[in-house]
């Protein structure tokens, strides 16, 4: 690469420049999420619910690092100032997510870091989580072309956390954990922006001749949805307000929506459940009457999802 072009910035991708600016305008911080009122809500969770949410937040907290590792590997395959700038911002947002999850875990574990780390080590061996991670590791290892790497990354961003976000959002239906629900709103919206970015990367920087067939892509998405469904089927049994059938419908609808964004036809034709508790694209945005704050971004929002 030409030395000057490598080090002297000039706009080379309007799409990623726009996403970078959107990220700046929609930035939020861990200090904006108050968990003060959420502490008392822990007493309203039965033992099954409490264990489920401890598990989910421990998984999500560790997964943030996984996402950043994949970003660094992915960006190395492309050369674009604006793409690199955008993904630097995305890595920063993933770090914010990690800090918020750490705060939530401190609440669940009563600031006992030793117990938190011991629990995290234990759940890595959980059968449902191990199956999910095994599938992901296999797909990452098998992805040899840039197109395949981007598609796997797209699934990590768009499918890999959906059942967790959906399950956390059901706490709002129960009038519980306003702070946790607000954090979940912010993070799930951020992840949808990240999904859009991965789709933009696939559409604009991966040549058509490198892209797999629509049939191959559709089969990959079916695999991912099945893995995510099996995960929540195994972990969500008996948890209050967690409707696994509705989550599966939402997974299928989300997969179709992502496929459409990369110009591939739907594989399910499923509509999202009408009572979806998530507030980003594809669901109705609602503000619980009992919440102190709206789930909108605190700063001025551009292109609100």
Swiss-Prot record:
Gene: RIR2
This protein's UniProt keywords: DNA replication, Host membrane, Iron, Membrane, Metal-binding, Oxidoreductase, Transmembrane, Transmembrane helix
GO BP of this protein: deoxyribonucleotide biosynthetic process; DNA replication
Membrane topology per record: Single-pass membrane protein
Active site: 101
Species: Equine herpesvirus 2 (strain 86/87)
Catalytic activity: a 2'-deoxyribonucleoside 5'-diphosphate + [thioredoxin]-disulfide + H2O = a ribonucleoside 5'-diphosphate + [thioredoxin]-dithiol
InterPro entries: Ferritin-like_SF, HSV_RIR2, RNR-like, RNR_small, RNR_small_AS, RNR_small_fam
UniProt-listed SUPFAM superfamilies: Ferritin-like (SSF47240)
Official protein name in the record: Ribonucleoside-diphosphate reductase small subunit
CDD domains (alphabetical): RNRR2 (cd01049)
